[in-house]
Each structure stands twice: as structure tokens, then as C-alpha cells.
Swiss-Prot record:
The keyword DNA repair does not apply. This is ADP-ribosylation factor-like protein 6. Keywords: Cell membrane, Cell projection, Cilium biogenesis/degradation, Cytoplasm, Cytoskeleton, GTP-binding, Lipoprotein, Magnesium, Membrane, Metal-binding, Myristate, Nucleotide-binding, Protein transport, Transport. The lineage of its organism: Eukaryota, Metazoa, Chordata, Craniata, Vertebrata. Mg(2+) binds at residue 50.
Length: 186
């Protein structure tokens, strides 16, 4: 199999691997989103909160994603910065039904955007306004306003309304992210 891998790489058939950081507060749906992006035969049936981080892989039409699913629990968020240097893209997940913690999500986003390993890089950021199926959720436009996303001028970003359990909105986001990554790589 190693020979076939090398041959496909030489012919340009091998998918480019990209490292993506999946960030957001605890219980926002990060692990559920990443699980749903994997092929159905590789998906976990039981999703448990991530402790520290986990590494997951999935493929799109032209890229191979290695995703660092980072715990969003308060005591683990300081670990995020150790992975910033190697991240080529960021998925930031927001629980759109949790208006009370939107302020905390904004604080964490601001900390991320101002970190020296992120601040001066044109790294694409995909925002999933998750849990749109819940009655108390706010629209992705409102999430964008609450997080002041329009103030992000030096990085490409996109926000998608999503329902991780049903998989709604996820493909739109991955397609956008893939386009952004390929634009940087070419």
C-alpha cells in the first residue's frame, strides 16, 4: 500500500492534508459536528464531552482534514494556544441557543484572534452557529452581531447555521473552508 500512496502522491492524486483546530465553548457541539463529517461507517454512536483534545480525520472531495477537537471546558481552554502554530484553519462552534454564554464565547474568540500565533496570519475561520433546531436559538446573523464578526477584517471567515445532530449546514461550511484552504495553497 505504501507504493500506491507514493505513486498517487507523485501523480498529484493524493489529497492534501490540512490541520484544522475545532474550538468553542463546552457543549457547543464541536465533537458532534466533527463526528457527523466522518463517513457514516466511522461515526461514533455515543458522543461524550472531550477531555483535553482528540484528533479526528475526515476527507472532502480534494482535502484530507486532520481535526484537533479541543475541549471547550474552562479548565482546558488554555491548551488551545499550544496548537495555534500548526493550525491551517479554524472551526469555531457556537451554541446559538445559549445566549447567556455568548459573552464568554466572544471573549474566547477575542483571545484567539489576538494571540501572536494567530493575529498576523490570514487563517480562514469557519463559524458554525450550531443548535439552530432548538426553540431558543438565535439566527446566524444575530450570532454574527453578538460576536462582532464583521470586525474581523484580516482573515477570511464565514458563518453557517447548523444542526449537528441532523448534519444540516455542515457541508456548506466544509465546502467554504475547502475553497479557502485551496486558495491559500495555490
Amino acid at each position: 500500500m505504501g507504493l500506491l500512496d507514493r505513486l498517487s502522491g507523485l501523480l498529484g492524486l493524493k489529497k492534501k492534508e490540512v490541520h484544522v483546530l475545532c474550538l468553542g465553548l463546552d457543549n457547543s457541539g464541536k465533537t458532534t459536528i466533527i463526528n457527523k463529517l466522518k463517513p457514516s461507517n466511522a461515526q461514533s454512536q455515543d458522543i461524550v464531552p472531550t477531555i483535553g483534545f482528540s484528533i479526528e480525520k475526515f476527507k472532502s472531495s480534494s482535502l484530507s482534514f486532520t481535526v484537533f477537537d479541543m475541549s471547550g471546558q474552562g479548565r482546558y481552554r488554555n491548551l488551545w494556544e499550544h496548537y495555534y502554530k500548526d493550525g491551517q484553519a479554524i472551526i469555531f462552534v457556537i451554541d446559538s441557543s445559549d445566549k447567556l454564554r455568548m459573552v464568554v464565547a466572544k471573549e474566547e474568540l477575542d483571545t484567539l484572534l489576538n494571540h501572536p500565533d494567530i493575529k498576523h496570519r490570514r487563517i480562514p475561520i469557519l463559524f458554525f452557529a450550531n443548535k439552530m433546531d432548538l426553540r431558543d436559538s438565535v439566527t446566524s446573523v444575530k450570532v454574527s452581531q453578538l460576536l462582532c464578526l464583521e470586525s474581523i477584517k484580516d482573515k477570511p471567515w464565514h458563518i453557517c447555521a447548523s444542526d449537528a445532530i441532523k448534519g444540516e449546514g455542515l457541508q456548506e461550511g466544509v465546502d467554504w473552508l475547502q475553497d479557502q484552504i485551496q486558495a491559500v495553497k495555490t
